[in-house]
C-alpha cells in the first residue's frame, strides 16, 4: 500500500476539466472547491489503493483527510453524479477527436455475501464457475470501441422482479404436479426492466446525449440474439446489429423450416484468416442471407469456428449489405468488453468496495470507479502514446507507474517537511496499521496431539481384532 499525501497531478487537471465542462451543462454551476478537492483525492486514492474504503484513504493520506468527512461527502454532498459521467465522456471524446465507433454490450456479476440485506439489486444468480448459486449484483455495461481507445459509456443494475420470481418458482412446482395451466396462478406483470430493456436503454441514452456520434455497429452476445432487442436498437438508430443465435433456432430455406445447425451441415466452410485479439487466426466460415423465424425477416447468418474447434457458432447481422468477413471482424471486437470488465474488477476499486447501502451507495461507488477509468486517459504518458497513434498502455502497468509516482511525491514531501523523522514515524505507523496481522486458523496452537492415539482399555478389548 503506497502513501498518498496529495491529489495526483493529472487527476487535479481532470477534475478541474470536469468542473468546467459541468458549467456548460449546468447553467454555469460547476463543482465547488470542496467538491473538487474531495473528488480529486478520492479518485487518486482509488488508483493508489485499488479500493473504495474511507478508512484506508485516511491512513494513506497521513490523516490529512478524515474518513468521517470523506464518507459524509459521498453520502450527503449534492454532486451531480449522473452528469459527472456524461461530462467525463465528453472530455474523452473531445480530447482525442473521437467521432465514430462500435458499441458493445455485456453484463457481469459482482459477488456479495449470502447474508447481504441492504445492498442494492443483490439477488440470487447462478455461479458459472461452480454450477451452484451465489448472491451477486448484476451490472450491464455499455462500452465504446474506437480506433484509438476503448471506454465505458454507462451501466445499469439488473434486478429480477421479486413477485415474478416467486410466481415462476410456484408455477414450476405446480407443473411438476401436472396441474393444468388454467388452474395455475396467472403470470404477474413485471415491474422491473429485463436485461434487454436495460441494454436498449443504455444505447438510447448515449444516442440522445451524442446525436452526432456515428455508431458503426452494436454488438452483443447470444442472449440478445432476438427480435425484441434488434427492434429496440433499430428504433433508436439505423446501424448494424451483430449478435448470435442458438444452433437449434429455426431458419427458412426455400420456404422450408429447419434448424440453423442442420442447414450449415450441408455446406463446407470456407477457410479465412481474421484478426482477433490483435493476432491473425485461421477460421472456417460460411454465410447465408436467410429468413430467421424468431426475427420474422431476413438475416445475414454466418457459421464460424476457430481452428481446433468442432462446432460452429452462428453469428447474425441485420444489415445485409455488409460482407461476411466484415461482420465477423466486427464481432471479434466483443472480447474488448471482457477486457474492460477484467480491468474494472482488477484496478478500479469497485471489486473491493466497502459496503455502501442502498441504490445511491452502489451507483455512486460504480460511477467513481468508471471515472477512474476515464481519468487514466489524461495521464501524460498514456495521452502521449495515444497522440502518437501507438497502442495505449495497459491499465495494470499504468496504475503501477502512478503508484510509484505517488510514492515518490510522498517521499519528497517527507524529506522537505519541518520534522522529517516525526513525519516518517507517523506515516509508517498509519500504513502498517492497514495490514494488521490476523490469527490464522491453519496454525492450531492449542491443539492437543496426545488425543490422537489409541486408549489402553480399548486396545485390550480389541486386541484380537484385525
Feature roles, as predicted:
Residues 1-37, 45-46, 53, 59, ...:
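A short, flexible helix-boundary coil/loop motif
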Residues 22-37, 45-122, 205, 209, ...:
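Electropositive nucleic-acid engagement tracts
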Residues 43, 73-174, 284, 289:
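Active-site-proximal, Lys/Arg-enriched surface segment
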Residues 57, 99-113, 142, 218-224, ...:
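Short, conserved catalytic/metal-binding motifs centered on acidic residues
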Residues 68-73, 127-213, 298-314, 318:
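Electropositive, glycine- and tryptophan-enriched low-complexity nucleic-acid-binding patches
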Residues 109, 324-355:
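Short amphipathic alpha-helical "interface-anchor" segments enriched in bulky aromatics
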Residues 112-114, 152-153, 228, 251-253, ...:
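Short helix/loop capping segments that flank catalytic or ligand/cofactor-binding pockets
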Residues 177-256:
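Domain-level cores of phosphate- or acyl-group-handling catalytic modules
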